[in-house]
Amino acid sequence: MRTNYCGLIDVQYLDQTVILYGWVHRRRDHGGVIFVDLRDREGLVQVVCDPDNPTAFQVAEKIRNEFVVRITGRVRHRPPGTVNPNLISGEIEVLVSSIDILNASLTPPFLMDDESLSEATRLEHRYLDLRRPQMQENLRLRYKVAMAVRLFLDQHGFIDVETPMLTKSTPEGARDYLVPSRVNTGHFFALPQSPQLFKQLLMVSGFDRYYQITKCFRDEDLRADRQPEFTQIDIETSFLNESQIMQMMERMICTVFKSVRNIDLPTPFPRLTHGEAMSKYGSDKPDMRVSLVLTELTDVMQEVEFKVFREAALRTGGRVAALRVPGGGALSRKEIDDYTGFVAIYGAKGLAYIKVNALEKGMDGLQSPILKFLPENVIQIVLERTGAKDGDLIFFGADKAQVVNEALGALRAKVGHDRGLAESGWKPLWVVDFPMFERDEEENRWKALHHPFTSPAEGHEDLLETDPEKALSKAYDMVLNGSEIGGGSVRIHRQEVQSKVFRALNIGADEANEKFGFLLEALQYGAPPHGGIAFGLDRIVAMMAGAESIREVIAFPKTQRAQCLLTHAPSTVGEKQLRELHIKLRHA
């Protein structure tokens, strides 16, 4: 039986006999002696095979990288000059008395410490990739975060309740993954996008405080921070208002960061309304490490000669805004062109700018292709509002407000980090007072900004029917360093209010009853006031790990094409299986 993990042996075990199991990380022959770096999940230890022990030495001559071995030996000091201060085991080595090969290995397609691997290679051989120390550390970190969450919630009276994985397809924003029913011909289950409705029903059932760390599924286009299946820390509670829920969740996140990473998040988290966030930062998840802000200019551009600005300022739902970049006057033409290409990703048709060379020279101290289209008094207002100084550069966005916000909001974050205008550390905040609805221009109707079960703000219930555009909600998002790590709301607990929301969303009574009849009925049986939040576990762990993608903290992730390169899922299935499910494929 193993006595120790390789990476945890240190000088306290000197002269003790240990039994180790692990993988051969590297084998070296030096001066007639064989050295083996033996690796397990805790790290490395140096093992020495001396020719004075011919039986063990003969076995050691056969081993290669990634062989699985059992080693018995005595712990001793490393010779002077060979200490490795980067390892816990760096002061000692194990002199082998016996060695057994438990399994051989093919030559691996890459070394475990190779940092230049393509992601495709890593995902194709994920079982080998996961042997690498960084991946071991990432998954250990994930475990610690989940345990810290469970401990906090247990201490605060929450109970873990599992909800169904096979459920009903309901409109929640993204496409569902559908599962055909064999026994109910023509009917389909859906994999849950979240446990939203079930956790609300648990509140109706009187469980008071619920949580679950669970898989959720969304069939949507993938980005670095998205997966078709992801893990959610799902939380719901009764009889707490939004402020009380936010305070408790703030304590939970602070506790998790402190216990897992010894990070003290600054408290209390500032609160920013959705309107302020979009106006000043162009984003509902602003990175507060970046000091740059947007400046509103719509009101002063309505009569200017420059057509792009004037038309955006006059159109309904249009916006003209500026972003001042301190020291940005040093940007080259190529750098500006690169930023122009960057904002094009977000729908911007161009990126006008003014370089501020010398304010004391008036118009002669400015440099821009658009100066001739703007009157001097308007330019003066721009300089005053943005607080421009010599050496600055001012970028402009003019289009539909959504395009301007997305383009300048993303540019703000990128320029801030590119130009050293971002602080280090952690900057959390709450974004609150979200609109209830947003306009779906393609379908010409309102859709829920979060989900249709979010409660309207106090005094906004009547607006659901009279002026939906102005209705605010009791929704709140927790944002950290520009990433939304959690989102929640107080829910609707009265059936008549839920019906009003459905009507505002153009969901008729028959459709509402077909899709949500069970919820509407449950709300009539003494549903308590309740609310909750859901955190993205993958995203939180990735941020703690400093990973560029959540794929780095998921054991077996999918690619951005929603494929598993290891198992080659999704795959075709046999005709017999399709017949059993009453499915016939139509080939395009």
Swiss-Prot record:
PROSITE patterns: AA_TRNA_LIGASE_II. It catalyses: tRNA(Asx) + L-aspartate + ATP = L-aspartyl-tRNA(Asx) + AMP + diphosphate. GO terms for molecular function: aspartate-tRNA ligase activity; aspartate-tRNA(Asn) ligase activity; ATP binding; nucleic acid binding. The keyword Transmembrane helix does not apply. It is found in: Cytoplasm. ATP binds at R218, D219, E220, Q227, E484, G536, L537, D538, R539. Its main location: cytoplasm. Its EC number is 6.1.1.23. The record marks H30, G81 as: Important for tRNA non-discrimination. One of its GO terms (cellular component) is cytoplasm. Keywords: Aminoacyl-tRNA synthetase, ATP-binding, Cytoplasm, Ligase, Nucleotide-binding, Protein biosynthesis. Residues 196-199 are annotated as: Aspartate. GO terms for biological process: aspartyl-tRNA aminoacylation. L-aspartate binds at E172, R218, H450, R491. It comes from the Bacteria. Pfam families: GAD, tRNA-synt_2, tRNA_anti-codon. Homodimer. Aspartyl-tRNA synthetase with relaxed tRNA specificity since it is able to aspartylate not only its cognate tRNA(Asp) but also tRNA(Asn). Reaction proceeds in two steps: L-aspartate is first activated by ATP to form Asp-AMP and then transferred to the acceptor end of tRNA(Asp/Asn). Belongs to the class-II aminoacyl-tRNA synthetase family. Type 1 subfamily. PANTHER family: ASPARTATE--TRNA LIGASE, MITOCHONDRIAL, ASPARTYL/LYSYL-TRNA SYNTHETASE. NCBIfam families: aspS_bact, PRK00476.1. This is Aspartate--tRNA(Asp/Asn) ligase. It comes from Nitrosospira multiformis (strain ATCC 25196 / NCIMB 11849 / C 71). The lineage of its organism: Bacteria, Pseudomonadati, Pseudomonadota, Betaproteobacteria, Nitrosomonadales.
